[in-house]
Amino acid sequence: MKKYLAITSKGLENLLADELVALGVTDPKLVYAGVTFEAPIEVVYRCCLWSRIASRFIQILSEFDVRDDMDLYLGASAINWPNYFTADKTLVVDFNGTNREIRNSQYGALKVKDAIVDRFTKADLERPNIDKAEPDLRVHMRLSGEKGILGFDLIGSGLHQRGYRTEAGRAPLRETLAAALVLRSTWDESKPLLDPMCGSGTLLIEAALMACEMAPGVKREKWCFEALSDFDPEVWTEIRSEARVKSRRGVKKVDTHFYGFDRDYRVIQTARDNARRAGVEDLITFDVGDATKIERPEGFENGVVICNPPYGERLSTEPALIALYSEFGRQLKEQFGGCTASIYSSNDDLLACIRMRADKQFKLNNGALPCVQKNYSISESAERKEAANIEVAPEFMNRLKKNLSKLGKWARKEKLDCYRLYDADLPDYNAAIDVYKDYIIIQEYTAPKEISEDKARRRLTDMIRATVLVTGVETNNVILKVRQKQSGKNQYQKLAEKSRYFDVEEYGVKLIVNLQDYLDTGLFLDHKLTRKMIGDMAAGKDFLNLFAYTGSATVHAACGGAKSTMTIDMSRTYLEWAQKNMNTNDQTGTQHQFLQADCLQWLQQAEGEFDLIFIDPPTFSNSKRMDQTFDVQRDHIMLLENLKRMLRQDGTVVFSNNKRNFKMDEEALDKAGLQAKNISKQTLPLDFARNKHIHNCWIITHKED
């Protein structure tokens, strides 16, 4: 008997061996990502047609040492290729692997191709042609170190191509992988199966094919073994006909129920189309549904919930996924007691959010991505109701409810779309939570070193889940950021090209925010009362805004009736943002000027006079674009002395900064001919009342005679 290699994904070797034994193979031997065996041709045909897990079957012609390209050529030349196929058949060589001497797979494929063609030429036969697109035959060469395996790929395009899926949903699973997940999920034909995040339906379709005993290759039209000289059409026709009859009968006998849900109606339609092409459309009910709100179907006793939920590469950038897994886990416990669940993901942190202990788990890559499949037993009804009624982080949740009741009412009254809901009120939940219209930003402060990663992750997931439950925000509208002390060049670091800009309202003024591109959003929430005050003071005045950021104070001044405005910042990005803010409020014209400049240098040589000046400098700056460093405690008098020169006699400077324990040098200020009034308390909005040191704010005027 001839020797064969069945190829599969790493981690599925045992499962494949069991499948091959069921198909008639005796004495299979496990190898890396595959199984070798010897079998008669009818068993091989049956394996090709019926295997749900193998991606390819290789007829092994030779195994030989390959130290260099000469060994490769001689090893391939030793095979009498004309005995296996005729010259009218087209072929391609698939070369997998490299070693120290053969470092390029294309070069290796070329040497094997040369050896094959030369054997035909030496036998005075025509050369077979190469066809990379649609070859009759695929020659398979696998190189591992100095060991080579050479043979025919009996399949052609991989066995995962069942013929029913012409388009897929998000991040589709290969059919062979999906079949393996089903086989390891605790499901069998006697149990109903539900996929709450079904995408294009692959898991359910593969399970339905198993239930009705439909061969996965029954709809396949082309097989490379048909081009080999020893192909036995009678045996193959009999095996395929038997499979077709079995499939037709099987569909009629199945009484197992399959359910698929997805939030995207377009993907659901794709799943229905795929099921129709697979011939199992009558067995599966597909519908639009949210996995976090999914209800147990009637008659779903002892059923299995299986899914491949989305998973991000980095937990810190995917708060919506934390909320999704957390809420999905809660829904499983509440709705599916007595059932089992099988979940496949690459992210253990996300799987931990489900809050169930796995009975079994299997490591299994999705392509090159390491993943794990975990099987869970869901407790019966009494226990699950108790689990469902337990509040997530009750102390944190209660504080959030209290804050939302108080601050939400205040924000609506003040016509504020944005406010701080929570600001590290509880030491165990060290984060700031901001509301931006229909979005929530959770800004997690870096955990102390003595807090373990597991505990920090648990608290973070609790915060996200509790925030979603209390506020009712859509999980996709939750944004997570890790906040650290920012200085100089990384204060306005760009995060990603997601460009989520939208308008928010603040005391009747529209301002543009961006929640994801930068560490900050374009709007400092603690200054909302300061900006309102500037708007109230600005009527008929010439206004100057220094270190202007996105110009929100300028917008308030302009909307408050300022005669003119000058907005200065060193960043072109933020100046353009400021202009857009002004345009959004119909504040246009030459009376509104924008200047890109280093504010410190500009002040030293600037001319002109202003009635109202707002300056909110950084606490410290060492930007490469500034010639000197700046420290607000050290340099504030110098700053104010320069401003005095530009301030009209009855004018006002609103001076603010965020340095904790800032001390105004009133003696030096007096010598400079200026006087100061601390208005920090008056400019502290209700949502920042718990953080009295978030900023300090001063009214600076010329000293009265």
Curated annotation (Swiss-Prot):
InterPro entries tied to this protein: 23SrRNA_methyltr_KL, DNA_methylase_N6_adenine_CS, RlmKL-like_Mtase, RlmKL-like_Mtase_CS, RlmL_1st, SAM-dep_methyl-trfase, SAM-dependent_MTases_sf, THUMP_dom
GO cellular component terms, semicolon-separated: cytoplasm
Cell location: Cytoplasm
UniProt keyword 4Fe-4S present: no
Keywords: Cytoplasm, Methyltransferase, RNA-binding, rRNA processing, S-adenosyl-L-methionine, Transferase
UniProt-listed Enzyme Commission number(s): 2.1.1.173, 2.1.1.264
SMART domains listed in its UniProt record: THUMP (SM00981)
Gene Ontology molecular-function annotations: 23S rRNA (guanine(2445)-N(2))-methyltransferase activity; RNA binding; rRNA (guanine-N7-)-methyltransferase activity
Reactions catalysed: guanosine(2445) in 23S rRNA + S-adenosyl-L-methionine = N(2)-methylguanosine(2445) in 23S rRNA + S-adenosyl-L-homocysteine + H(+); guanosine(2069) in 23S rRNA + S-adenosyl-L-methionine = N(2)-methylguanosine(2069) in 23S rRNA + S-adenosyl-L-homocysteine + H(+)
Superkingdom of this protein's organism: Bacteria
Limits of the THUMP domain: 43-154
Coiled-coil zones: none
Family per record: Belongs to the methyltransferase superfamily. RlmKL family.
Role: Specifically methylates the guanine in position 2445 (m2G2445) and the guanine in position 2069 (m7G2069) of 23S rRNA.
Entry protein name: Ribosomal RNA large subunit methyltransferase K/L
Source organism of the structure: Aliivibrio salmonicida (strain LFI1238) (Vibrio salmonicida (strain LFI1238))
Lineage: Bacteria, Pseudomonadati, Pseudomonadota, Gammaproteobacteria, Vibrionales
Name of the coding gene: rlmL
